[in-house]
Design a protein with these regions (language model features):
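N-proximal low-complexity "stem/linker" segments adjacent to membrane-targeting elements
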Residues: 1-22
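Short alpha-helix within the catalytic core of nucleotide-sugar-dependent glycosyltransferases
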Residues: 40, 48, 62-73, 147
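Short aromatic/hydrophobic "clamp" motif used to bind/position activated sugar donors
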Residues: 51
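The conserved acidic donor/metal-binding loop of glycosyltransferases
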Residues: 55-59
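Conserved donor NDP-sugar-binding/catalytic core segment of glycosyltransferases
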Residues: 63-95
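A recurrent flexible, glycine/aromatic-enriched loop bordering the glycosyltransferase active site
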Residues: 105-128
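Donor nucleotide-sugar recognition loop
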Residues: 117-122, 134-151, 155-162, 166-169
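Active-site-adjacent helix/loop segment of glycosyltransferases
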Residues: 159-240
Length: 243
C-alpha cells in the first residue's frame, strides 16, 4: 500500500552523503522523508500517492500536510499544487507567464486558479503526474527546475493549482541571482515547453538570452521533442496560466 505523502527535502549539503541527514521533524507510518541534493533521487525512491518537494527554507509541518490532504480531497482531479509561503513580510505565491514573457508572481489575494509554476521552495505533485512527466531536468538552474516540470506537466495533461488557503511557513532565499544566469534559465524553460514564440517574447526584452538558447539548441530540441510528443496541452490550458 502506498504511503499518503513523501517529503523530498533538497539541499546541496546532502550531496554524496557528505553530511548526516537531519532527523525528520516528525514521523508517521503514512509519511516518508528523503534528504537529497537532487530531486530525482527522491522521486526514484518515493512510494507515496503525493510527493512534496521542499527546500530547507520552508517548514513542512503536520498542519501543512493535513491542509494538503484536505485540498487533495476537495480537488481529487488536480495533479499538482503550488502552496503559498507565509514569510515575515507577507505571502509569496505561485507564478504565471506575464505579459512581458517572464514568470511573474500572482497577486497576494489571488483566488483559486491554475498557475505556470510554483515558488522554487515548495510544490506538491501526485504520483500519477510524476509517472507521466518523468524526471526533473537538473541541468537547469534550481530556480527553474520546478517551473520546467510544471510546464512539461501540461503536455502530460496535468495542471498546477494555486489554492489560497494552502499555506506553508518559510523564509525563501532571496539572494539575487546573476541576471545572465536567470535569463538563460528562463528562456530555456520557456522554449522547452512553450516553443520559440514564448522564448522570443522573453528575448525581446532580454536579447542576450538568444545566445544562451541557441548555444545549446540541439540538446534542448531533444528534450523539447520528448516533452511535447503526444501533447495533451490545449489552448485553454495555456490561457489559464497566463497573466
Amino acid at each position: 500500500m502506498l504511503r499518503q505523502f513523501d517529503v523530498i527535502v533538497v539541499s546541496e549539503r546532502f550531496a554524496n552523503g557528505s553530511t548526516i541527514p537531519p532527523t525528520p521533524p516528525f514521523t508517521d507510518p503514512s509519511l516518508g522523508w528523503f534528504f537529497v541534493d537532487d530531486i530525482n533521487k527522491g522521486l526514484e525512491a518515493s512510494e507515496a500517492e503525493w510527493i512534496i518537494v521542499a527546500s530547507e527554507q520552508v517548514k513542512v509541518t503536520r498542519e501543512f500536510l493535513n491542509n494538503l490532504a484536505e485540498c487533495n480531497a476537495s480537488f481529487p482531479m488536480v495533479d499538482s499544487l503550488a502552496p503559498r509561503i507565509r514569510t515575515a513580510n507577507g505571502f509569496v505565491g505561485a507564478k504565471v507567464i506575464g505579459k512581458n514573457g517572464d514568470f511573474v508572481q500572482i497577486d497576494e489575494n489571488a483566488s483559486i486558479r491554475y498557475v505556470a509554476a510554483p515558488q522554487p521552495d515548495i510544490a506538491a505533485f501526485s504520483r500519477r503526474i510524476v509517472q507521466r512527466t518523468g524526471r526533473v531536468d537538473n541541468s537547469l538552474p534550481e530556480e527553474f527546475q520546478l517551473a520546467d516540470y510544471s510546464l512539461r506537466m501540461l503536455h502530460a495533461g496535468g495542471r498546477m493549482l494555486n489554492i489560497p488557503y494552502l499555506v506553508i511557513e518559510g523564509s525563501p532565499d532571496n539572494k539575487s541571482q546573476n541576471t545572465k544566469e536567470y535569463n538563460a534559465g528562463c528562456i530555456k524553460t520557456l522554449y522547452k515547453s512553450l516553443g520559440i514564440s514564448a522564448a522570443g517574447k522573453f528575448a525581446l526584452r532580454h536579447p542576450q538570452s538568444w545566445i544562451s538558447l541557441f548555444s545549446g539548441i540541439k540538446a534542448l530540441n531533444v528534450k523539447r521533442k520528448a516533452a511535447i510528443t503526444l501533447s495533451k496541452m490545449t489552448a485553454e490550458m495555456l490561457h489559464e496560466i497566463r497573466e
